[in-house]
Structure formats: C-alpha cells, structure tokens
Amino acid sequence: MLMITSFANPRVVQAFVDYMATQGVILTIQQHNQSDVWLADESQAERVRAELARFLENPADPRYLAASWQAGHTGSGLHYRRYPFFAALRERAGPVTWVVMIACVVVFIAMQILGDQEVMLWLAWPFDPTLKFEFWRYFTHALMHFSLMHILFNLLWWWYLGGAVEKRLGSGKLIVITLISALLSGYVQQKFSGPWFGGLSGVVYALMGYVWLRGERDPQSGIYLQRGLIIFALIWIVAGWFDLFGMSMANGAHIAGLAVGLAMAFVDSLNARKRK
C-alpha cells in the first residue's frame, strides 16, 4: 500500500477516486485528520500521480463530475454525527489502542477505591527478588497513574500517537513498540528511583520518537509528527530533569522510551528502504 496524497475536503477526494476507478485504477480512502488516498498496486503510482497533477489543476472539470455520477457518489461524503467527539475517538483508535486505554482507566479507578499502595503491590515493577518471575510486572507498571491530570495527559498522547501507528502500520506494530518500550523504560526508571513508579509516559515517549523519525525517514509509511511536538517533548524532558515545575517525573522512563522509539523507527525505516 502506498499513500498518494491527502485531502481536507472529502468531496474533492471522492471525485478523484471515482475518476481513477473509471480508468481501471482502484484507490481507497482512509479517514484520519484528513482523507488519505492509498494505492494498493504500487506499479501504477507514476500514472496516478500524473493524473493527480492534472486533477489539481482543474478539479471542476466535467469529466470528474461525470465519473462521480457513474460511480454513484454525488453526495458530499460528509456524515454528520450527533456526537462528533466520540466519533473521532472511535475512528482514530484501533482495538489495541482501546484495550490499553480501558485498562488504564480500570486500574486508575481501582487505585482510587483500594488505594495506590494496594494496587502497586500487584502491578508494580518487581520490588522483591521473589517477584522476578511475575512477568506481568515488567509491563503493568505502565497502566498505573497517580492523578487525573497524569492519566488524561498520557491517554491523550497514547490515543493520538498509538492510534495513528495502529491504523497505519497495524496492531502488531503497536503491540511490539508498547511491550519493548514498557520493559526497557521501566528497567531504566527502576535504576533511577526504585520500583515504585508508574505511568504510560515511557511508552508515549517511545511513540513520539517512533512516529517522528519514521515520518521523517519514510514518509510513505503514512505517519508523521510535527517537529514542534518533538521539540516540546525534549523541552519537557529537560524540565523534568532539572525539576523546573516541582513535579515528580519519571525522567529515566522518558529518556529510555524516547531512545527506544527512535531506535525502532531507524531500523524500520531502513528495512522499508531495502524493500523498495
């Protein structure tokens, strides 16, 4: 699959896709922040891009409208929903994204009811040698959050970045990034502060690093992160390291997570180039 272009206007993208269908080229539309056009048969990429250039010069050409009539797509392509916020949540998040979000919320509620310490006894990084074979602990520390702001901040980024990775690269890729970054960021953080920590931020930083570098080195992957946001992430790490806001931050997890994401993106982008 090759992403050809993105359109902000669904009417325009549908007209182009319908026209190409009349020319024997099948394109698909994926709705994210914009309407992304994907081509399954990459051997036709040059032809599609040439036609796209002609289309952009005059999208109102009668032949494009005629193609839409022929395909039966004369509507706006817009679907108005009563609850656009929840529709946006659903469209961007795949099953793994949802499972992790729900797990974090359930654990957060349990911590409010039972207390932080009680839940940490079951989910925290192994704090005693006898617990080292309770393998879930190397990952479940990422599900624990200690304030409403903590969980909201992490889940917003998880939904935004994790959802993009899952939608574009598949659930398997998101699972691999999540497990590796949770394990390694947790290992580094326990070296910094001991086993009593929690939060999804190590995984979030891994996703930030991955999405940014993969988008820079492999634009055809269809994922990207604005450079301003990765700069924000670096500033936040520096602020946490020097305790500029007086907040307790898992600095080791943040740095390790970012490094893991960058490393995985570098390897994946190299592999993508070799396949071309």
From Swiss-Prot:
The chain crosses the membrane at residues 94-114, 142-162, 169-189, 192-212, 229-249, 250-270. GO terms for cellular component: plasma membrane. It is found in: Cell inner membrane. Its EC number is 3.4.21.105. InterPro entries: GlpG_N_sf, Peptidase_S54_GlpG_N, Peptidase_S54_rhomboid_dom, Rhomboid-like_sf, Rhomboid_protease_GlpG. It catalyses: Cleaves type-1 transmembrane domains using a catalytic dyad composed of serine and histidine that are contributed by different transmembrane domains. It is a multi-pass membrane protein. Pfam families: Rhomboid, Rhomboid_N. One of its GO terms (molecular function) is serine-type endopeptidase activity. GO terms for biological process: proteolysis. HAMAP family: Rhomboid_GlpG. Rhomboid-type serine protease that catalyzes intramembrane proteolysis. Belongs to the peptidase S54 family. This is Rhomboid protease GlpG. It comes from Shigella boydii serotype 18 (strain CDC 3083-94 / BS512).
